[in-house]
């Protein structure tokens, strides 16, 4: 097998990849815009009238740290808005990324409360609790490392509920602590819950789609339990509601680069559930083990809420396996170590683009023995072509005998007919793993390289890199010996660089740059290997 046929194999692998991506997109089709209907009784007011609560609504208070800007509704104490201050909405924008949102077009909230027989959030006990606060806005001051937002509600029976949000500097994980002071004469049966609720259909301004070719990123729910470290649960899966009991884990809503998650921290078994609401919304949540607060006693209940980017090391520190929410697809076992290596290199280099170039040299250096074996195998196969042709003429149409004698010839000449394919079969998963890494790692979102490349996770706006990639592919093809004599195959090979250039027009610029550098290294390695093969009589220069 010669290098031209290797290019055909690469093309076949690419087509297979594209078909698989198309199947994934069909399985989880992007949602279309749809008007959000009236919220259910568990939903708080519309945030379009912020600061002017409608009848039955609570007051909207604002909370700001160095990394988060939140809006909390005092009716129930739900987080209705969340902006990520360190992440622009789009490249070059002054607006921070809008993660949680409550508008007439789209609802995405982090809810929590106390249900159970005596819970103030139990619909059977009336409207959700209306908390009071000492002020309408809270902000983390300079030199302050922790911000506490206490909210108090006193029920008709005299029981006092204090819901406190605790935020820390530089942290996307916030604690939600409930303190129940039962001053009544009766015990209270309570169940802590946390829920993430989101509109199933995306309005245009929330569309996370990309112009990258065949790109599909997951948007939906996920959870981790005692039995499953990480499991996606798409909106379509919620036609059959989740209902499991676990002693550990978390529930989450995911999208490209960002996530929200509830992590129960109260001891005991938790119930994880999903629910498709009748208003075009879906929810995933947890219910903690029920507790009984004796008359005249006090009880604390708590959970942790993650609202932010999918930063793997920080998420892993918050909860086991929470870092698995970074969507590296089915090649996660390659993408994860690749990203760790890339991050290590970035610590020294300081530029993600040059780090990708460095990792390309490392990968190709490690692959060099296989590459050398590939070219040696192809050279031996070329030398066997006259013997194989003579064998075909001698044996004729007896396929079984031809196959037997071919294998005997390969064995006697110590040639592996698949030796030229094996290195490619290893390189393609690495290439695809890098693709997923670029699409799933928030660190590479809007990461600049140099000159006109301002975002390595987006396509080259001027298509310069794909054209350069096609040029390098053309040179590799011209420098490679060929045994292809079929006119149709020759025509296909002639247009292969053009076809690949078109493929790469919409690929992330970081991935195209990886392929360009990989091709340049291939050219250098090719010349080095050919010189060695010439000395062994396995290769001769030929004019193309």
From Swiss-Prot:
Localization per Swiss-Prot or TrEMBL: Cell inner membrane
Keyword set, alphabetical order: Cell inner membrane, Cell membrane, Chaperone, Membrane, Protein transport, Transmembrane, Transmembrane helix, Transport
UniProt-listed Pfam families: 60KD_IMP, YidC_periplas
Keyword Protein biosynthesis: no
Region listing for Disordered, in residue ranges: 112-132
Alphabetized Gene3D superfamilies for the sequence: 2.70.98.90
Transmembrane segments annotated in the record for this chain: 6-26, 343-363, 418-438, 456-476, 497-517
Keyword NAD: no
Topological category with respect to the lipid bilayer: Multi-pass membrane protein
Gene Ontology biological-process entries: protein insertion into membrane; protein transport
One cellular component term from this protein's GO annotations in UniProt: plasma membrane
Source taxon at top rank: Bacteria
Main location: membrane
Molecular function via GO: membrane insertase activity
Protein family membership: Belongs to the OXA1/ALB3/YidC family. Type 1 subfamily.
NCBIfam families: PRK01318.1-1 (NF002351), PRK01318.1-3 (NF002352), yidC_nterm (TIGR03593), yidC_oxa1_cterm (TIGR03592)
Function: Required for the insertion and/or proper folding and/or complex formation of integral membrane proteins into the membrane. Involved in integration of membrane proteins that insert both dependently and independently of the Sec translocase complex, as well as at least some lipoproteins. Aids folding of multispanning membrane proteins.
Assembly and oligomerization: Interacts with the Sec translocase complex via SecD. Specifically interacts with transmembrane segments of nascent integral membrane proteins during membrane integration.
Protein's UniProt name: Membrane protein insertase YidC
């Amino acid at each position: 097998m010669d290098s031209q046929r290797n290019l055909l194999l690469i093309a076949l692998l690419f087509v297979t990849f594209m078909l698989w991506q198309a199947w994934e997109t069909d399985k989880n089709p992007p949602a279309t815009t749809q008007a959000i209907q009236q919220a259910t009784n568990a939903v708080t007011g519309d945030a379009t009238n912020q600061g002017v609560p409608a009848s039955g609504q609570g007051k909207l208070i604002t909370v700001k740290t160095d990394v988060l800007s939140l809006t909390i509704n005092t009716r129930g104490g739900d987080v209705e808005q969340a902006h990520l201050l360190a992440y622009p909405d789009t490249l070059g924008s002054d607006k921070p990324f809008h993660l949680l949102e409550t508008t007439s077009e789209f609802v995405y909230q982090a809810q929590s409360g106390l249900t159970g027989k005596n819970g103030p959030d139990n619909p059977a006990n009336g409207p959700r609790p209306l908390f009071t606060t000492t002020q309408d806005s809270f902000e983390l001051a300079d030199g302050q490392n922790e911000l506490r937002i206490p909210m108090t509600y006193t029920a008709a029976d005299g029981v006092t509920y204090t819901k406190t949000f605790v935020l820390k500097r530089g942290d996307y994980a916030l604690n939600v602590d409930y303190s129940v002071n039962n001053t009544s004469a009766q015990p209270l049966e309570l169940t802590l819950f946390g829920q993430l609720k989101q509109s199933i259909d995306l309005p245009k301004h929330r569309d996370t789609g990309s112009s990258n070719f065949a790109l599909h990123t997951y948007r939906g729910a996920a959870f981790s339990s005692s039995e499953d470290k990480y499991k996606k649960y798409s909106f379509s899966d919620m036609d059959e509601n989740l209902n499991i009991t676990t002693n550990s884990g978390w529930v989450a809503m995911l999208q490209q680069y960002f996530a929200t998650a509830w992590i129960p921290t109260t001891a005991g078994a938790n119930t994880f559930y999903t629910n498709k609401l009748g208003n075009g919304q879906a929810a995933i949540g947890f219910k903690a083990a029920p507790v009984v607060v004796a008359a005249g006693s006090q009880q604390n209940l708590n959970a942790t809420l993650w609202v932010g980017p999918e930063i793997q090391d920080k998420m892993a520190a918050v909860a086991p396996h929470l870092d698995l929410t970074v969507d590296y697809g089915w090649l996660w076992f390659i993408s994860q170590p690749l990203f760790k290596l890339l991050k290590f290199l970035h610590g020294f280099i300081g530029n993600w683009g040059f780090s990708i170039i460095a990792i390309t040299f490392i990968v190709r250096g490690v692959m060099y023995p296989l590459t050398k074996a590939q070219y040696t195998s192809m050279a031996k196969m070329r030398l066997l072509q006259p013997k194989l042709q003579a064998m075909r003429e001698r044996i004729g149409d007896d396929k079984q005998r031809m196959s037997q004698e071919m294998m005997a010839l390969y064995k006697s000449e110590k040639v592996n007919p698949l030796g030229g394919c094996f290195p490619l079969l290893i390189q393609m998963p690495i290439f695809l793993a890098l693709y997923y890494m670029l699409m799933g790692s928030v660190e590479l979102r809007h990461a600049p390289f140099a000159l006109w490349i301002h975002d390595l996770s987006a396509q080259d706006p001027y298509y310069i890199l794909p054209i350069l990639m096609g040029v390098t592919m053309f040179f590799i093809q011209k420098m490679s010996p060929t045994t292809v004599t079929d006119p149709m195959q020759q025509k296909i090979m002639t247009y292969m660089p053009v076809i690949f250039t078109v493929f790469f027009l919409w690929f992330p610029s970081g991935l195209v740059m990886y392929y360009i550098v990989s091709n340049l290294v291939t050219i250098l390695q090719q010349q080095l290997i050919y010189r060695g093969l010439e000395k062994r009589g396995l290769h001769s220069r030929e004019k193309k």
